[in-house]
Amino acid sequence: MKFGKKKEKENLENIEKDKDRDKEKEIKEKEKKDKKSKDKKKNQEIEKDNNINNNNNNNNVKKVFGGSLPFLFEEELPTILVQTIDYLQLFGLQTPGIFRENGSLASIQSYRSLYDNDKPVNFPPHEAHVVASLLKAYLRELKVPLCTFEHYDMFIACESIADEKVKVELLKKVIAHLPPFNRKVMKYIFSFLQKVVENSNVNKMTPDALSIVFLPTILRPQANTDLEILQFTVEDSKSTKTLMSSILLNYDEIFEDPNLFQPRTRQARAQTDFVSPPSSQNSTSSSSYLSSKNPISPRSPIGSSPNFTTASILSALPPPPISPILSSNTTNTTLPPPIITSSIDDNNEPSLSPRIITTTTTTTPSPQPTTTTTTHRLPPSNPIPPTPTSNSQSQLYPNLPPPSSDPIIKSTTTPTLNSQSQSQLYPNLPPPLPDKNKCKLLPITPITTNESNTLQPTTPTSTNIPPLSIPPQIGGNSDSNPISPTKNQSQLPILPPKPPSLTLPPKPIPKIPTILEYENNVRQRSNTTMV
């Protein structure tokens, strides 16, 4: 019994010890968790401070990729442009497919990070395609492209001009409107691209190929997404196909102009002098078209028809005298209302009646007023010309009969012309037809022709037509002919007899055996089998 009680006590003690150990472990774990949470908070605070410091440092450092070009009046070119173009002039001018083939993405991203963090970059001599694609990425990711968004439509408009000289002049104007630093960078890039084109026999990069590959990095429209930019570039690729070639082939004329890099005045900046001049063909055609047009006469008053003869009449008149100019003069002119009379000239046109108009001018220094008389020809105010009189009708139409005196008959009936007047007016008309009442019908007689080809009337004569002859019979009498004779007791010819037909004799009819014969045949067969 004692032994059992001791074991129970030991077990109870062990259980209590285990409980104490578990409590200690829980306490230690809580302490560890508290320490970890405190450490995390400290680390987060430290990271926040570091991020703030890094952001301040990054704000001071300009981003290379995805940024913008330097200030307008800065003289130094970007380092990435200078390093990449210098490298490509040494190792990329004779590499085939330069700017067309892309380099490895990993090396491009490593160089991008170096440029963004403002660290030194060294290119190995065998990475021409990587450096070329790095240069394209820098120009493509600028916030504002080298040829700005505002000038995109201007460059596209230059491409649509067929005359090369006019196109070059317009390109010079458009490039002159770019910001000064953009012009400087553009000249630096195109001087390098001109060397690439000179080695096109080796690198296979012609101006047209460069316009397809390199031009979208410089010239692009303003869009929100990359898909829109691609869509615009594909649509405008046909219009910008020869733009790069026209700039490269005329590099000296465009970029070597001393007026290109001169600072523009405020007036020049305020003026919008970019107006697309017409091409040579269009200009000549328009000038010839304008010169061929007749001069337009001054317009007649409101409600009147346009009179095209007033221009020549007014131009032939002498100009009115001009009074001498006096200092501190005050003039008062009075024009009376014009009196217009219309008449018909020889050419059947309404003429202008001259009207003498007096203008009185009074000047303060001179006590006596000066009067000047000028004659003006005013156009008719009525749009419809007046009806011609009898005299004018007789002059224009001398062959017409005189008008009737009765006004009612004049308005209702029209004058009729006699045969004599018709023959005088229209000599080529045929003679008039006779009246039907006066015409009589004549008997119709037959007409025959003589040997002398003269038509003479003859009487009808009876002619005896001989009967048809029937050939004689070829053999046999009339009795043997099966065909009946005709009404004229004439017989038709007899056909030859048919040849005898080759016929076989008829087959004999087989005899049907009787019952006795059938039994005899059966007996004979049975006897033969038994033997």
Swiss-Prot record:
Site (Arginine finger): R100
Highest taxon of source: Eukaryota
UniProt biased composition (Polar residues): 446-466, 475-491
Ranges where the record places region Disordered: 1-60, 266-304, 324-508
PROSITE patterns to which the protein is assigned, alphabetical: RHOGAP
SUPFAM superfamilies named in the record: GTPase activation domain, GAP
Basic and acidic residues bias locations: 7-50
Coiled coil spans: 4-51
Principal cellular location given in the protein's record: cytoplasm
Intracellular or extracellular location(s): Cytoplasm
Compositionally biased tracts (Pro residues): 494-508
The UniProt record lists the keyword NADP: no
Compositionally biased spans, kind Low complexity: 51-60, 276-304, 324-344, 358-375, 417-427
One cellular component (GO) term of this entry: cytoplasm
Family annotation (CDD domains): RhoGAP
Keywords noted in UniProt: Coiled coil, Cytoplasm, GTPase activation
Any one GO BP annotation for this protein: small GTPase-mediated signal transduction
Domain Rho-GAP: 67-255
InterPro entries from the UniProt entry: Rho-GAP, Rho_GTPase_activation_prot, RhoGAP_dom
Role according to the record: Rho GTPase-activating protein involved in the signal transduction pathway.
The protein, known as: Rho GTPase-activating protein gacQ
Gene source species: Dictyostelium discoideum (Social amoeba)
